[in-house]
Amino acid sequence: PTDEQYRLSRMIAAYAQIKSECAAMKNRHHAAKDEEAAKAYAEIIKAMNEQLEVLKEKIKEQTEKPNCKEGVKRLETIPAIGRMTAAVLFHHLTSSKFETSNKFAAFAGLSPQQKESGTSVRGKGKLTKFGNRKLRAVLF
């Protein structure tokens, strides 16, 4: 990956980490029994949300750089894929080289798997739970 792609991946990782911490902080805020603690949690949540917005803007700026722009724009042509989802997909597509689309689908945990025993096949195939959890979470 180029320096621009590496910066994009670091920003995406930071965004995901802060978003996860913000969700945990919201749970603490909800469970707080003390008014002062709840107030402190609310201030922290507000600061985290502001930082998430700043990071989102920086990610958008990074996707406008020459090494990222074309790939992200192509991914955005897919229905229901926005800038953030396209940026995450672009990061995963460029950080690993996939020989076929089937290999990428397996990496993302989007390939169907059938349950079979010997010659019998039980039911229809379902999506596997294998693959990259973070990538699958962005897509669903």
What do the PLM-derived regions correspond to, one by one?
Residues 1-74:
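Long, charge-rich intrinsically disordered scaffolds of nucleic-acid metabolism proteins
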Residues 7, 52-55, 79-82, 115, ...:
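A short alpha-helix capping/helix-coil boundary motif
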Residues 7, 74-77, 103, 138:
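Residue-level recognition of specific faces of alpha-helices
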Residues 32, 36, 66, 81-84, ...:
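Residue-level signal for short amphipathic helical patches enriched in basic/charged
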Residues 42, 72, 76, 83-90:
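Short, well-structured alpha-helical segments
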Residues 71-79, 126-130:
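Cytochrome P450 C-terminal beta-domain/meander region
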Residues 83, 87-140:
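Phosphate-backbone recognition surface of nucleic-acid-processing proteins
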